């Protein structure tokens, strides 16, 4: 199994892959090995599986080659490669391995990479139809080539299935919605004078966390607390912005937390915000809803669909984000 993020990282793949790996291992008695990028040393982490971590801070070319070689090495005695990240590297390694590939698609890595580096401003859908220069066009072609080499693609939404079909994918596509465990107790919202707002996210630009911090600053209320759970390349910039805000003492960066610590914050949250420019079907949003927390989210991916007629939360206009 290949994945770009894995616990203690926070994010959809880091939530999903351990669950499905545990099911394959414990219920089906499959032999599982996981390859991921990480900021941590293997010796510092207690895993339930065989996990190989590659330092994501290595020089990009060296890291890329090391990842391909490691996938090849681990995959030689395996029957199947399950790809939930590191898709291009897995595809190249599989040219030599010739194994079956099942791939989970939750977005467009070419769009996310270009957007996070501020090379584009277009939305997910606009990106698919617009013509770009050589660099971005090449990345789009590589992404399409990699996806089309999969034997089966699994995706959480019809929107993403349409995206995959438009790439020219001819093999089987399965829509399997993301799921969460229902907690035994729900949050008690608005039970005191403080309003606790929570975000659980990778700290990357398309999540629009900077804009949420600025909006909270504009409200300038000592009664509003913003809990930001997660880590990522935008952390230092977001912390700098929060220190310049009107209510810096009420904006808390929790970093990476264990599941029980996140659950504790959910139990004390009044509002959950998901303000991304794109999502497939976000685990964190579903988890917040499972606690009965009112949610505010942008109408991207399947978010609008799962909110129904705003009886489970409210839609934020992308224009106002």
Regions found by a protein language model. Name each.
Residues 102-141:
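Acceptor-binding helix/loop patch of EC 2.4 sugar-transfer enzymes
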Residues 2, 154, 180, 190-207, ...:
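Conserved donor-binding/catalytic core segment of Leloir-type glycosyltransferases
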Residues 277:
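Aromatic "clamp/platform" in nucleotide-sugar-dependent glycosyltransferases that forms part
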Residues 319-321:
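Conserved small/polar residues in nucleotide/adenosyl-binding loops
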Residues 239-260:
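Nucleotide-activated donor-binding/catalytic signature segment of Leloir-type glycosyltransferases, i.e.
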Residues 68-75, 125-153:
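Membrane-proximal helix-turn-helix segments that form the acceptor-binding/catalytic region
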Residues 75, 147, 256-257, 264-269:
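Short alpha-helical donor nucleotide-sugar binding micro-motif in glycosyltransferases
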Residues 294-297:
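Short hydrophobic beta-strand element within catalytic cores of glycosyltransferases
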